[in-house]
From Swiss-Prot:
HAMAP family: AcpS
The species this protein was found in: Shewanella amazonensis (strain ATCC BAA-1098 / SB2B)
Protein name: Holo-[acyl-carrier-protein] synthase
Function: Transfers the 4'-phosphopantetheine moiety from coenzyme A to a Ser of acyl-carrier-protein.
Keyword tRNA-binding applies: no
The encoding gene: acpS
Length: 125
């Protein structure tokens, strides 16, 4: 299995917290899919959840070689946890089309946080 793309992103959690305070859930509704938004609403650490998802989606978009835009939106990239709690990605629309164009079949995702930052790395295989 060869690596077709690699993406990494880092997000300052305080920046997300500030945006949530100023704009309410507007940012979350732009970034998260419906199922992600349901988890966000019930989360006790909303800014952390959103920061990690933002970083993950940016990392995936970078691995696809497009970034957000150019046919790939936040809504085309959905994160979820497998039965062991590992982060996974489900692509749709422009993101799925781009992965298929590149000959990819899966994306491996790692998400972490430490006090002030959330970071994610995505590998397209």
């Amino acid at each position: 299995m060869s690596v077709l793309g690699l993406g990494t992103d880092i997000v300052e959690i305080e920046r997300i917290r500030s945006q949530l305070e100023r704009g309410g859930d507007r940012l979350a509704k732009r970034i998260l899919t419906e199922s992600e938004l349901a988890i966000f609403v019930g989360s006790g650490q909303r800014e952390l959840y959103l920061a990690k998802r933002f970083a993950a989606k940016e990392a995936v978009a970078k691995a696809l070689g497009t970034g957000i835009g150019r046919g790939v939106s936040f809504q085309h990239i959905e994160t979820y946890s497998d039965e062991f709690g590992a982060p996974c990605v489900r692509l749709s629309d422009g993101a799925l089309e781009r992965m298929q164009q590149l000959g990819g079949s899966q994306i491996r995702l790692s998400i972490a946080d430490e006090r002030h930052y959330a970071v994610a790395t995505a590998i397209l295989c």
